[in-house]
Amino acid sequence: MNKLERLIVTAKPIAFFIRKSKQLIIPGFRGIPLFDVVEFFFLQVKKIGLNERAASISFNVIMAIPAACIFLFSVVPYLPVSNQFKAELLALTKDLSPNQNTYKLVESFLNDFFRKSRGGLLSFGFLLVIFYASNAMMGIIRTFEKSISDAKTYFLHKRWRAIKLTFILILLVISCVLLLIGHDALEKILKHYFHLSKSTSLYWWENTRWLLIILLIFLGNSFIYKYAPSVEKRWNLVSPGSLLATFLTLATTMGFSYWVNHFGSYNKVYGSIGTVLVIMLLINLNSLILLIGFELNVSITYLQKQVEDRKAKEKIEKKTSI
């Protein structure tokens, strides 16, 4: 610890916070004090790093997007509400886009997929499409394994897990869009039969669509944390890491959108390619957040194992002393 770090740690407000954090146990931390979790988390991040791993995940996600879209849009025409699905998916994309230019680029990309029929892919190129779409999950699984020293899994087992996770995430997106379609249909009924067009109740109802979007993000993170790591004992679906990652995703997306719209000058400097850079940067930030949530879960699990091992050792020592 250098002189500057010593001055910071010994400062009264910081010392008070450290003292309290050693006594504070947050629900979901399995009885581990906040200070111990934070300390181990930063040591783990310093040892393994985050930036390179986030870049690796980002690359795999970007490369897997076309294949995932081909599969998704090959399934959509078979849904009874395919037109509404398309409109709602574009509306969901608009809600999550940092600015109008980004949305226009994504909208053009999605419309291109919708216009071209790819029904044959469901029978002929299905396995190839799924293979490439699951590369994003494979990248996440490989990146997670760097934090788990005893993670030993065969390639085929990892690939099968990646394919299952890809299916789960695609089903989550489809389910969320279908729920949003139902939400909009119910909103029209409220407007027509109950004349709630300008009421406060309708305002709150319109904003409940954000609850579905938040639920989509949370469940996506939760399923990844539960099934992607190569561990014997799976984490719970609701974990501190998934909650933190969901909060950081929402906060980062909103903050990033505000910055792009008010302070960013990508389009002025790079022209139309600036929009692509915005999308890539947003993917990279969310990859970083995914790793932060994962490392939090790893920290809690590792410290809990240390406590359990220590208790087991003390129990054995007591028996031998008797």
Predicted regions and their residues:
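Membrane-embedded alpha-helices and immediately adjacent juxtamembrane helical segments
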Residues: 2-322
